[in-house]
């Protein structure tokens, strides 16, 4: 039936994991263990295409996992986290002549659980993190093409909510948090083709309105007394922004394509930073309902130049000025008198300067070589509350990265070799500590059988077993070997 189709896919992964705490950071007693993992997913889609003007598809996405956190004291499985994710999405779309449209609706529910255990003052403590997140929304873009232009107009609505808490098992303590955020956006864009399609001009404007409300935080109990000063209803807040974009592309010949662009971006904070106080990946942190959105002005110039029939070069330079940049900083307060307490704050100004260059070479059919270099220099420029951070580089932002691959698809099997390099990365906001740069090499072999019905592949990641540090606390897994078998039932 050419008007009706069904797509179905699923997967399951399981691993005993590895212990990523280096010997130099282990303590006595040593509670570190391997970080196990098991996950599975199911995706189903039904498509109905009766006419060109009206088409519909309905999709369902299910994901569940259980991942060890690398520490075990008393709990049978040690510390772990678990996601139960369900998403339903429908899409209506079609076209007639120069007109086309889309309308997408979605709803998703995510139930999260994390078991956390620790030793404090010689006593065992355990608390379970439970949170329920609901998200729903819609987006509808309309597009009308003219002889020399293409005009688009649309709107988007997103609503997200969280109801979560840290529930202590070894005591009656609890930390509860709630909050909702609603974002309404409208946008318009026009693309103009000039001088026989040698020049393309794009002009766009987007309006965003974000509203944080229904915020609540409550901490009860002796073990969480450092947080109970923040108890109560959180302040409602609304932010709005108008974001323009202008881009110009020049194509004098088929071998040359150059562009210059300016755009402004707007990003509201996540609910965890607005309404949740507790433990995050940085450590203990407190909510900041006053946390405004992040804004950025981005300037970019670049292009693609075909140097020969088989060789192309694509360089770009960019400069971005961030305002009210979202960044975790220490508050100056201590938990238990020793652990820094963090809060996501708006850093007044951040400058990001960078270069990226991409080289693609196809010497003959079946062989492709790619080499990419990027330079990135993100610095705090004006942070009035913490002037000592001015001119410091953002954490986990390597200045230099090199990556590339060689891909052969002209033989019995497809073979790929790839490598990547990252330079030193600072791990503290004052740039007093850093992890060293590292280089990784991978190899992959794959092949389709039976007219693309059966896929068999294998890869070795980090062939030379480079046990570098991924963060200031955690070490990489080293050499990994994967085998993948997939069956395509849709052919």
Regions inferred by a protein language model and the residue ranges of each:
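Gram-negative outer-membrane beta-barrel transporters
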Residues: 194-196, 201, 209, 314, ...
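Repeated loop/turn-to-beta-strand initiation elements of outer-membrane beta-barrel proteins
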Residues: 3-6, 53-56, 98-101, 148-151, ...
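Outer-membrane beta-barrel signature, preferentially recognizing the C-terminal barrel domain
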Residues: 74-95, 131, 175-183, 232-243, ...
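C-terminal beta-signal and adjacent terminal beta-strands/loops
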Residues: 15-21, 266, 321-323, 379, ...
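Extracellular loop and loop/strand-boundary signature of outer-membrane beta-barrel proteins
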Residues: 27-32, 69-80, 87, 119-130, ...
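Surface-exposed extracellular loop regions of Gram-negative outer-membrane beta-barrel proteins
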Residues: 3-20, 55, 59-66, 101-120, 159-166, 209-229, ...
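Transmembrane beta-barrel wall of Gram-negative outer-membrane proteins
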Residues: 1-14, 25-66, 84-96, 144-147, ...
């Amino acid at each position: 039936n050419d008007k009706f189709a069904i797509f179905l896919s699923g997967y399951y992964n399981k691993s005993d994991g590895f212990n990523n705490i280096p010997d130099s950071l282990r303590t006595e007693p040593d509670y570190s263990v391997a970080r196990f993992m098991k996950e599975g997913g199911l995706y189903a889609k039904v498509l109905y295409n009766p006419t060109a003007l009206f088409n519909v598809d309905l999709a369902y996405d299910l994901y569940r996992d259980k991942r060890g956190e690398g520490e075990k004291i008393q709990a049978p499985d040690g510390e772990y986290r678990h996601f139960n994710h369900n998403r339903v999405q429908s899409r209506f779309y079609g076209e007639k002549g120069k007109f086309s449209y889309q309308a997408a609706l979605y709803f998703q529910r995510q139930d999260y659980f994390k078991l956390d255990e620790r030793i404090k003052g010689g006593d065992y403590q355990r608390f379970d993190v439970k949170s329920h997140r609901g998200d729903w929304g819609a987006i509808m873009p309309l597009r009308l093409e003219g002889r020399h232009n293409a005009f688009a107009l649309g709107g988007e609505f997103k609503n997200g909510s969280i109801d979560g808490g840290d529930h202590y098992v070894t005591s009656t303590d609890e930390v509860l948090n709630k909050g909702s955020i609603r974002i309404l956006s409208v946008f318009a864009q026009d693309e103009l083709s000039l001088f026989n399609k040698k020049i393309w001009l794009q002009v766009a404007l987007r309006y965003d309105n974000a509203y944080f409300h229904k915020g609540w935080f409550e901490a009860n109990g002796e073990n969480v007394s450092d947080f109970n000063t923040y108890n109560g209803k959180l302040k409602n807040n609304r932010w709005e922004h108008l974001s323009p974009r202008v881009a110009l592309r020049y194509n004098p010949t088929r071998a040359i394509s150059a562009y210059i662009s300016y755009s402004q971006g707007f990003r509201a904070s996540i609910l965890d930073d607005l309404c949740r106080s507790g433990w995050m990946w940085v450590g203990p942190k407190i909510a900041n309902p006053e946390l405004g959105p992040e804004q950025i002005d981005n300037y970019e110039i670049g292009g693609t130049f075909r140097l020969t029939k088989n060789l192309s070069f694509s360089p770009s330079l960019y400069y971005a000025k961030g305002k009210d940049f979202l960044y975790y900083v220490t508050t100056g307060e201590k938990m238990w008198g020793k652990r820094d307490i963090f809060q996501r704050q708006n850093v007044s100004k951040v400058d990001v300067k960078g270069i990226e260059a991409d080289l693609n070479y196809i010497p003959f059919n079946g062989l492709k070589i790619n080499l990419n270099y990027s330079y990135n220099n993100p610095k705090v420029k004006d942070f009035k509350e913490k002037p000592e951070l001015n001119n410091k580089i953002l954490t986990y932002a390597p200045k230099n990265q090199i990556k590339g691959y060689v891909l052969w698809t002209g033989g019995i099997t497809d073979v790929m070799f790839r490598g990547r390099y990252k330079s030193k990365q600072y791990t503290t906001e004052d740039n007093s500590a850093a992890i060293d740069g590292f280089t990784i090499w991978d190899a992959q072999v794959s092949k389709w059988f039976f007219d693309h019905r059966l896929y068999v592949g294998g890869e070795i990641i980090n062939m030379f077993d480079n046990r570098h540090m991924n963060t200031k606390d955690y070490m990489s897994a080293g050499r990994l070997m994967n085998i993948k078998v997939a069956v395509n039932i849709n052919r």
